């Protein structure tokens, strides 16, 4: 049977996404269950498969199908798949193959050097690798091209449509509001007591509670599973296989509970993408920021709100150690929402989190724009942490070396976290006009919330660009005031000032 060009193109996309699914499954395995001695072999296999994907994306076949089909068909899934494939082709084709291979090798070396450097608190041993990564990223940005700022070309990889000038409109406003709020909180007479949460909380019990909450959120365990790992993540292999991982700390249940809900938010997005997008490059979240908005929506806007615990505190106490039996809900709620500037981003509370991101954004942007050099990073990092958060790292492993992102060459990624938070606040505000969120949560029924998110966001996968989606859902462009209002209102109530 002679295939049409459209069929051949869709077959090629299917081949590509099949390799990607295999890569995803291996990556999940490496980070959860794989034996230590098998790691080197596994890395080799991943390298071979990644090269296959790269070959397909940049093949003459791909190019000729794109050229032949462009403008020929009205089918929206095909049109968007072509756009996506063409953008990937152009982006990848602009980088010489030899350079790309060198870069991939450097990434894996840099990641293992970073792990060592972090353990030994030795920035100098990692510095040459980071310098090379920065040079590669500057070159790549030049290959790809940009209008105003070289950093824009890197932002585009994670958040299409976002530029330095857009960030400069919102970040300084948010920073000013948050630092002022932080000052008021530090001076507030009524401080929560986090010690009420301390004590041994067996892993098995945390796991049961976490599973129960995931089920209530609408996570489908027949299309997923919950496992343990060191750095929690969610991974969507396809919409019927979306896995969640978490980390248990028997001395602090918050790590697993809020971590699982966060990853569960990512997973719900992937589980609810329209099946007709399967085997296309559209069967995933539209951007890092929109993905993060979904995890932060569930973690902060749902599971850290009072109504959530009014409904779930009894369930929690059934699984929790005995000491919680006598702990009043009010004290519990205030303790889980304590604001305390920390050195470590992933331990940050919801108010200071954006400030951590802004430190990284300022430094990244300056590195790519050649305003600063890699050797200046530790000192500048510490200075900015003191200026924004009022805390100063004593050593680089709790400062500039804490995150893996730069070691993996992920420049331009960090702003997505803060954008996701702003998107989430804006989405929540819109939802609250249509749904009485507190009442729905108090009744313990998240179905309405999940259906709202699926119909407006999840089902579209990558069919819509992030800012287009935001505007369609909320009726306006990015507006950081919703996040500032949410945090101000919430913490005035908790800290009573």
Describe each PLM feature range.
Residues 5, 37, 41, 58, ...:
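C-terminal, non-catalytic "cap/extension" segments appended to globular domains
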Residues 171, 175, 203-207, 213, ...:
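All-alpha helical catalytic cores of prenyl diphosphate-utilizing isoprenoid enzymes
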Residues 255-274, 292-296:
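Active-site recognition of the HExxH zinc-binding catalytic motif
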Residues 222-223, 276-280, 304-314, 374-375:
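Acidic/polar loop patches that form or flank catalytic/metal-binding clefts of enzymes
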Residues 9, 145, 262, 295, ...:
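Divalent metal-coordination and catalytic microenvironments
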Residues 284-325:
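Post-HExxH zinc-binding segment in Zn-dependent metallohydrolases
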């Amino acid at each position: 049977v002679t295939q049409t060009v459209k069929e051949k193109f869709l077959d090629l996309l299917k081949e590509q996404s099949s390799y990607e699914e295999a890569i995803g499954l291996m990556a999940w395995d490496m980070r959860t269950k794989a034996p230590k001695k098998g790691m080197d072999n596994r890395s080799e296999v991943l390298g071979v498969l990644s090269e296959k994907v790269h070959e397909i994306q940049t093949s003459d076949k791909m190019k000729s199908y794109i050229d032949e089909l462009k403008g020929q068909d009205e089918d929206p899934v095909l049109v968007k798949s072509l756009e996506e494939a063409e953008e990937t082709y152009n982006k990848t084709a602009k980088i010489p193959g030899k350079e790309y291979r060198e870069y991939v090798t450097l990434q894996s070396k840099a990641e293992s050097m970073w792990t060592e450097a972090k353990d030994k608190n030795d920035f100098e041993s990692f510095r040459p690798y980071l310098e090379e990564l920065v040079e590669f990223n500057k070159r790549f940005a030049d290959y790809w091209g940009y209008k105003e700022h070289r950093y824009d070309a890197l932002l585009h990889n994670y958040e299409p449509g976002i530029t330095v000038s857009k960030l400069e409109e919102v970040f300084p406003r948010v920073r000013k509001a948050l630092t002022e709020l932080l000052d008021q909180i530090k001076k507030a007479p009524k401080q929560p007591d986090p010690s009420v949460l301390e004590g041994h909380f067996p892993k098995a019990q945390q796991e049961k509670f976490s599973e129960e909450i995931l089920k209530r959120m609408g996570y489908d365990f027949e299309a997923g599973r919950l496992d343990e790992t060191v750095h929690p993540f969610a991974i969507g292999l396809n919409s019927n296989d979306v896995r969640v991982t978490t980390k248990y700390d028997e001395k602090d249940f918050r790590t697993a509970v809020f971590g699982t809900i966060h990853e569960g938010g990512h997973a719900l997005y992937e589980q609810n993408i329209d099946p007709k997008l399967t085997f296309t490059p559209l069967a995933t979240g539209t951007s890092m920021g929109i993905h993060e908005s979904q995890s932060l929506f569930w973690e902060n806007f749902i599971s850290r709100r009072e109504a959530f615990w009014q409904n779930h505190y009894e369930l929690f106490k059934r699984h929790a150690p005995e000491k919680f039996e006598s702990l009043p809900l009010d004290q519990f709620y205030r303790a889980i929402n304590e604001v305390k500037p920390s050195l470590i981003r992933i331990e940050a509370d919801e108010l200071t989190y954006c400030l951590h991101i802004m430190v990284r954004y300022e430094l990244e942007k300056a590195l790519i724009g050649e305003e600063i050099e890699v050797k200046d990073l530790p000192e500048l990092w510490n200075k900015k942490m003191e200026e924004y958060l009022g805390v100063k790292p004593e050593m680089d492993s709790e400062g500039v070396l804490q995150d893996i992102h730069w070691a993996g060459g992920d420049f331009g990624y960090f702003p997505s976290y803060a954008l996701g938070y702003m998107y989430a606040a804006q989405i929540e505000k819109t939802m609250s006009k249509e749904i009485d969120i507190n009442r729905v949560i108090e009744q313990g029924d998240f179905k309405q919330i999940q259906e709202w998110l699926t119909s407006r966001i999840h089902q579209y996968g990558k069919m819509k660009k992030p800012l287009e989606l935001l505007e369609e859902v909320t009726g306006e462009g990015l507006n950081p005031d919703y996040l500032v209002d949410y945090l101000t209102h919430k913490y005035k109530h908790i800290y009573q000032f």
